[in-house]
Curated annotation (Swiss-Prot):
Species, as recorded: Herminiimonas arsenicoxydans
Family annotation (PROSITE patterns): ATP_CONE
GO molecular function, a single term: DNA binding
InterPro entries in alphabetical order: ATP-cone_dom, NrdR-like_N, RNR_NrdR-like
Record key words, sorted: ATP-binding, DNA-binding, Metal-binding, Nucleotide-binding, Repressor, Transcription, Transcription regulation, Zinc, Zinc-finger
Annotated ATP-cone domain residues: 49-139
Name recorded for this polypeptide: Transcriptional repressor NrdR
One protein family per Pfam: ATP-cone
Originating gene: nrdR
Length: 156
């Protein structure tokens, strides 16, 4: 690795440690030319899939958009910021673990709906009404009935 002080190409690793989280490696290095020491970090770089929109255009995944969508649906609902962050993390993990380079936007919408269904039924209905483009009251009633069926314990 190139020395940041003298730009010499040869450095020596003095110490290597894994971070507490286990997701990075810290290396203490010494330049063989100028004898100065410096620290480097190695981390895994994971690329989120590209999002393919309904019109066919492609855009980079933006976690801020995901957060804004969840927060809008959850506006004035009793759900903590930590729960929202955890939901975003689960969605990101599902996208990463899919191994796909591209994901259609509809898949993200479905993941958001699943998370909202777990977090808050009212927020789920809010999001579903926009995401599924509800046209009339009957579609709201169907969605509410579906949520209600999921809450009832099975009869014996």
């Amino acid at each position: 690795m190139k020395c940041p002080f003298c730009q010499h190409d040869d450095t020596q690793v003095l110490d290597t440690r894994i971070s507490e989280e286990g997701d990075s490696i810290r290396r203490r290095r010494r330049c063989v030319s100028c004898d100065k020491r410096f620290t480097t970090y190695e981390r895994i770089e994971l690329a989120m899939p590209v999002i393919v929109k309904k019109n066919g255009s492609r855009t980079d995944f933006d976690p801020k958009k995901l957060q804004a969508s969840l927060q809008l649906a959850l506006r004035k609902r009793p759900v903590s910021a930590e729960a929202v962050d955890a939901a975003i993390h689960r969605i990101e993990q599902k996208l990463l673990s899919s191994g796909e380079r591209e994901v259609v936007s509809g898949q993200i919408g479905e993941l958001v709906m699943r998370e909202l269904q777990r977090l808050d039924k009212i927020a789920y209905i809010r999001f579903a009404s926009v995401y599924k483009s509800f046209e009339d009251v009957a579609e709201f009633q169907d969605a509410i009935a579906e949520v209600g069926r999921e809450r009832k314990p099975p009869s014996k």
